[in-house]
Amino acid sequence: MMSTETVPPVKRVQGHKGYKNRRRLSRELALQGIYQWQVTGGNARDIGMQLQQVSFFSKADGPYFSDLLQGVLEHAADLQTQIQPHLDRQIAELSPVECSILLIGTYEMVYRPEIPCRAIINEAIELAKSYGGTDGHKYVNGVLDKLATRLRAVELQHPPARNKDSG
């Protein structure tokens, strides 16, 4: 998936006024790293170190960022295999941004069971609204909803009590 596209910079972080939470910033930074990995084929460790040098990194949840970036890249092939049946085209045909968002959401559904799937999907939708194409958030929502039905069926039948700190 090599490309000459430039890596989209993380938006809305200057000053972080009104920033929703540290995990959202961690997801945005992980998105940037996964995107960079997809379009450049760069080394995961180097990408992670580069992103940790941005001036606002201290505002993010560093361990969560590292878990997302390293986890997605380590399990990318398996995650893509889980995503593919729910797509209307080959995963290689997705935009790198939307593919990265789907990888993050799928990783969280599989490897972060303490995070409610609705929170995972909502965060992915917000990433797609900020960084994806015009209707990318609708596509991401549809794919992750289908994945949640398979990966988190019990949770969907019996949703956990709402906890604002879990997402």
From Swiss-Prot:
Any one of the GO CC terms: cytosol
Biological process per Gene Ontology, one example term: transcription antitermination
GO MF term list: RNA binding
Keywords: RNA-binding, Transcription, Transcription antitermination, Transcription regulation
Pfam families (alphabetical): NusB
Superkingdom field: Bacteria
UniProt record similarity statement: Belongs to the NusB family.
Function summary: Involved in transcription antitermination. Required for transcription of ribosomal RNA (rRNA) genes. Binds specifically to the boxA antiterminator sequence of the ribosomal RNA (rrn) operons.
Name of protein: Transcription antitermination protein NusB
Species in which this protein is naturally found: Nitrosomonas europaea (strain ATCC 19718 / CIP 103999 / KCTC 2705 / NBRC 14298)
